[in-house]
Curated annotation (Swiss-Prot):
Its EC number is 1.1.1.72. This is NADP(+)-dependent glycerol dehydrogenase. InterPro entries: NADP_OxRdtase_dom_sf. GO terms for molecular function: glycerol dehydrogenase (NADP+) activity. The keyword Oxidoreductase applies. Belongs to the aldo/keto reductase family. It catalyses: glycerol + NADP(+) = D-glyceraldehyde + NADPH + H(+). Keywords: NADP, Oxidoreductase.
């Protein structure tokens, strides 16, 4: 993947084929607002900036929900790597993960 720096992707008519030889780019993570792709990452935008541009964020923060796992007897680290280990989550613990 070629390096894409400030200003190199916002050119008029820029497409995924220009840089990656694909039909389109499904997700292009950036740290500044551009409208050249179907979806952008917004890791350092403010809520006010997102609202101004009518962008609805989707958040993923498993480390922020520790209280959901206290009753199950597992640490957050155990739950996060459970897919690669033999830990079996109960239905109640699995439901807590999906809150």
């Amino acid at each position: 993947i070629p390096g894409v720096g400030f200003g190199t992707f916002a050119n008029e008519g820029a497409t995924g084929x220009t840089y990656l030889k694909v039909d389109y780019i499904d997700l292009f993570l950036v740290h500044w607002p551009i409208a050249a792709e179907k979806a952008i990452g917004v890791s350092n935008w403010t809520i006010e900036g997102l609202e101004k541009e009518n962008i609805l964020p989707e958040a993923y923060s498993p480390l922020g929900i520790e209280s959901n796992f206290k009753x199950g007897g597992y640490t957050l680290a155990q739950v996060l790597i459970a897919x690669g280990l033999s830990i079996q989550l109960t239905d109640x613990x699995y439901x807590a993960v999906n809150k």
